[in-house]
Amino acid sequence: MRKMIQKKIGILTFHYSTNFGGVLQSYALFRFLEQRVNGVEIIDYVPSTYIGHKFYRNIGLKNDFNVKHVLKRLMIKGKFCSRAVRRFDDFRAHSVVLSRRVDESTLRSWLNNYDMVVVGSDQVWSPGQRAEPAYFLGFEEFKGNKVSYAADSTIAEV
């Protein structure tokens, strides 16, 4: 039996997507840490830039706002996507521990609840993937350990 480490660790990642890869990466990192450390949770940080895009992304639209195309996608995928989103939400609710919801204005102070914050995995530093300053952990107020786990970018320099 492993000796459990007594630390509070927060994971800052794209846990809120409706993408199998992103959600499963969040889950895998959570489970790995949870087996070794008491007090692991995914920080329920959802950038405001994502909230406005959630609807059209869930019905399979990118940036195509052709009216005929939008109506067709709504009729074909609307019901399926709302069910899929519910399933993702259910999976997150029952498979990982989430912190209370935080946003840009509360994240800085919320991080002080942790001894360590792990950023990643996935493309958390990619400009095309909603690169948010929060994922760079440039907060001077946070005195805990800052760790990058498999964080990557689609460009050579960030």
Q: Which role fits each region the language model picked out?
A:
Residues 1-3:
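Short, Lys/Arg-enriched N-terminal segments with co-localized hydrophobic residues
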Residues 5-10:
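Extreme N-terminal starter segment of soluble prokaryotic enzymes
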Residues 11-20, 24-25, 29-157:
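Aromatic- and Gly/Pro-rich donor/ligand-binding loops
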